[in-house]
């Protein structure tokens, strides 16, 4: 699940929060990409 910390406003920075649960094995690496990069 990915969501914004605050309501987005075009042209302004914000923080994306990624929440992963019930994933096994518990040690994983998650990478967020913009346009596949």
Curated annotation (Swiss-Prot):
Protein source organism: Oreochromis niloticus (Nile tilapia)
Its job: Component of the class I major histocompatibility complex (MHC). Involved in the presentation of peptide antigens to the immune system.
Quaternary structure annotation from Swiss-Prot or TrEMBL: Heterodimer of an alpha chain and a beta chain. Beta-2-microglobulin is the beta-chain of major histocompatibility complex class I molecules.
Record keywords, A-Z: Immunity, Immunoglobulin domain, MHC I, Secreted
Official protein name in the record: Beta-2-microglobulin
GO BP term (any one): antigen processing and presentation of peptide antigen via MHC class I
GO cellular component, one term: extracellular region
InterPro entries: Ig-like_dom_sf, Ig-like_fold, Ig_C1-set
């Amino acid at each position: 699940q990915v969501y914004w910390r605050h309501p987005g406003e075009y042209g302004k920075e914000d923080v994306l929060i990624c929440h992963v649960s019930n994933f096994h094995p518990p040690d994983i690496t998650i990478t967020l990409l913009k346009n596949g990069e």
